[in-house]
A protein has these predicted regions:
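Alpha-helical transmembrane segments in inner-membrane proteins
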Residues: 1-314
Length: 314
């Protein structure tokens, strides 16, 4: 596929999946499309949420993979989703029902700040990656203890949130997520050349006059905020952060961030809308997180079996 054709084609594919998700995102199919209230009140927010969440997680994954030079890195590996899970678990223990989103966002934000604090003290990608992984393990252990000591009735809301869903966000949440995505996209665009240099190593980036620490900090800040916003509203949605950037590199045949940033946004949005559509076409809707795993696992396996080092391809 030619580079010049990849973005227009991705726009068409993403628009197609979005339209299908809007039209067929439920068991009643086209018949329900005549009901304006159903479309505007339920299906449109859900489809927009899927579109924005996919784009956000894919953009976050692209930045993480670039600064760590690892095709399997994504925002969740840094403990952000685990922090959101801790906030959600504490909220359910406290008997907070509809307010689970705010504790989840607070937990994700605290973990993000811890990672950013470490990032400001070290320039080692491996040290930062190990800290994020260990932070995630530690927080998940606390969540497991809380689950063990919480009544089953209180855990229903937590289990529902942790399964992942695009149905929990209204238009206010959509506006918030769109604003976070716009800010992150601006940050990534400004940081694009620096991330190109980082692909060749910190030493090369420094030799070219860039500041690797600043580049990594901006990428981590952007990715963490995206993951925190998405996870707090929708629960942990995995694999988009890995699959989206990988598909983008394959389609645009480049690792230059001027090309991969828009392609990653579109790939993530398309995959997310497709997963949401597949989760809704059955008589009983399936958890979108599980459907995403089914879609994403083959992509991850393909990366593992045929991966090559990330490098800038012209």
């Amino acid at each position: 596929m030619k580079k010049s054709n990849s973005i227009p084609l991705l726009i068409l594919v993403t628009g197609l999946f979005f339209a299908l998700d809007l039209l067929l995102g439920g068991s009643s199919g086209f018949a329900a499309f005549r009901e304006e209230g159903l479309v505007i009140g339920i299906r449109l927010p859900r489809a927009l949420t899927a579109l924005l969440c996919g784009a956000a997680l894919s953009l976050g994954g692209l930045q993480m993979q670039s600064i760590f030079r690892n095709p399997l890195a994504d925002p969740h590996i840094m403990g952000v989703s685990a922090g959101a899970g801790l906030g959600a678990a504490l909220a359910t223990m406290a008997g907070i029902g509809s307010g689970i989103i705010f504790p989840a966002f607070a937990g994700a934000l605290i973990c993000s700040l811890l990672v950013l604090a470490v990032a400001s003290r070290t320039s080692s990608s491996s040290t930062l990656l190990m800290f994020g992984v260990m932070l995630g393990f530690a927080v998940n252990a606390i969540v497991a203890i809380l689950q063990f000591s919480t009544a089953a009735e209180q855990l229903k809301l937590f289990y529902s949130w942790s399964a992942g869903s695009f149905s929990n966000m209204g238009f206010t949440g959509i506006y918030i997520l769109a604003a976070v995505l716009a800010a992150a996209l601006l940050t990534a665009s400004v940081n694009a050349h620096g991330m190109d240099l980082i692909l060749f190593g910190d030493g090369f980036a420094s030799f070219c006059g860039a500041r690797p620490g600043r580049i990594k900090f901006l990428a981590l800040l952007s990715s963490s905020l995206l993951a925190a916003a998405v996870t707090s509203y929708c629960g942990p949605i995995g694999f988009i952060g890995i699959a989206g950037p990988h598909l983008a590199r394959l389609l645009c045949r480049s690792s230059s961030h001027r090309r991969t940033i828009p392609c990653s946004l579109l790939c993530g949005a398309a995959v997310s809308c497709a997963a949401d559509l597949l989760s809704q076409i059955w008589s009983t809707p399936l958890p979108v997180g599980s459907v995403m795993a089914i879609i994403g696992i083959p992509v991850v396996m393909a990366i593992l079996l045929g991966s090559r080092p990330l490098s800038r391809e012209q």
